[in-house]
Amino acid sequence: MDGAFMLRQGAPKDLQALTDLSVEAFQPSFAEGVLDTLQTALNLPNYRSNVEDGLRKRLGVCVSLQEAGGEISQRGASSTEGQRRGCEGQYVLLVAQDCRDGALVGMVELGVLPCPIPMERRPAPDLPYLVNLAVRPCARRRGLGAELVKACHRLAKHEWGFTEMFLYVQKQNIAALSLYYSLGYVCEWQEPVWYKLKNGGQRMQRNPKMFLRKDQL
């Protein structure tokens, strides 16, 4: 990976930086303040506030992991007993920190949920679920996204004892799809393009979700 970055567990002190990162990565218009100002003027729900509230709750779940004090290295998660106890909660938020200036430039979340794919496998097994992979635009194309995903693979396999992971991505997110395919993920199911409405009509889904799974971590 090009550049000096440290992977570690997120902590409550990272709340504002992670909120900025999430908004910049997923909704750049809000990062520029344009839509945020419009929402405030119209008294609509504030996107940034919703992101911040969600992160605050999830970082609270990570407090025990942060207190364990282990950092995530390039070779895998620390296997201290304290960190293993934290992983029993089966949720972690990893951040990538620039070693030069301390800025947070990447994040990813990993939890455990019933895996809906492949659809013929029922009951659906509980498997690690990767979500909210984000890298600041200034830190992209350096392999950081791949390193965050690989860190989740190592943690899921060596700390939690799983051999599979799953996620979903929007069909039009070509960059993310390319990354996941390069790491061995396979598309198991895609949302239908057309949805039936209760009134009997149909609605087109312009950017359907694609559910991906990786076997043999």
Name each model-derived stretch.
Residues 162-177, 181-217:
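C-terminal "cap" of GNAT-fold acetyltransferases
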